Swiss-Prot record:
Listed InterPro entries: Ribosome_recyc_fac (IPR002661), Ribosome_recyc_fac_dom (IPR023584), RRF_sf (IPR036191)
Family statement: Belongs to the RRF family.
Lineage: Bacteria, Bacillati, Actinomycetota, Actinomycetes, Mycobacteriales
Protein name per the record: Ribosome-recycling factor
Species of origin: Corynebacterium glutamicum (strain ATCC 13032 / DSM 20300 / JCM 1318 / BCRC 11384 / CCUG 27702 / LMG 3730 / NBRC 12168 / NCIMB 10025 / NRRL B-2784 / 534)
HAMAP family per record: RRF
Length: 185
C-alpha cells in the first residue's frame, strides 16, 4: 500500500512537471516555435479546432514560421484566429501559406515574460507540494488505521520528501532554462 501511494505521487508529480514544461512553451520568446500556436483555436466546420491540427507549421528561419493549411478553404479562418490571438503576431497570406514573422521582444516585454514564466513555475511547484501533502495524509491514515508501522511510514515520508525535492528542482530547472531563453537577445 505504501509503495502504491509513493508510485501514484511520483506519477502525478511527473505529469505536473510535464504540464509546467508545456505551459512554458506557450510563452513567446522572440524565436519561432510552432508550440506557440498550441492554444490558438479556429472555427473548422463549426467546431473550434486547434490550428496545429488544421495545418502544418514549419520553421524556415529563426524568426519566421510558415503555416500551410491542409485545406486551402481554411486559410482565412486560420489567419483570423492568429490575428485575434494574444500572441502579438501578424500573419501575411501569399495564397499558399501564411508567413508569421516573430518580432524581437523589447527588454520590458522580456522581463514581463520572465515574470510570467516564474509564475507558471511557482504554480507547478505548488501543485507538486499539494501532491506531497496528499501522499503524506494517506501515509498518516495508513498508520492510524494500523495498516502500516510507524517506522515504515517515517521511511516512506522521507522518501516522499526526497522525491518532492527532486521534482521541485526539475521545475526550477525548466523555469531557469526558459528564463535564459527569454533573456537572450
Amino acid at each position: 500500500m505504501i509503495d502504491e501511494i509513493l508510485f501514484e505521487a511520483e506519477e502525478r508529480m511527473t505529469a505536473t512537471v510535464e504540464h509546467t514544461r508545456e505551459d512554458l512553451t506557450t510563452i513567446r520568446t522572440g524565436r519561432a516555435n510552432p508550440a506557440m500556436f498550441n492554444g490558438v483555436m479556429a472555427e473548422y466546420y463549426g467546431v473550434p479546432t486547434p490550428i496545429t491540427q488544421m495545418s502544418g507549421i514549419t520553421v524556415p528561419e529563426p524568426r519566421m514560421l510558415l503555416i500551410k493549411p491542409y485545406e486551402m478553404s481554411s486559410m482565412q479562418v486560420i489567419e483570423n484566429a492568429i490575428r485575434n490571438s494574444d500572441l502579438g503576431v501578424n500573419p501575411t497570406n501569399d495564397g499558399q501559406v501564411l508567413r508569421v514573422t516573430i518580432p524581437q521582444l523589447t527588454e520590458e516585454r522580456r522581463k514581463d515574460m520572465v515574470k510570467l514564466a516564474k509564475g507558471k513555475g511557482e504554480d507547478g511547484k505548488i501543485a507538486i507540494r499539494n501532491i506531497r501533502r496528499k501522499g503524506m495524509d494517506q501515509l498518516k491514515k495508513l498508520q492510524k488505521d494500523g495498516d502500516a508501522g510507524e517506522d515504515e511510514v517515517q521511511a516512506a515520508e522521507k522518501e516522499l520528501d526526497k522525491v518532492t525535492a527532486g521534482f521541485v528542482a526539475q521545475v526550477d530547472e525548466v523555469v531557469a532554462r526558459k528564463e535564459k531563453e527569454l533573456m537572450e537577445v
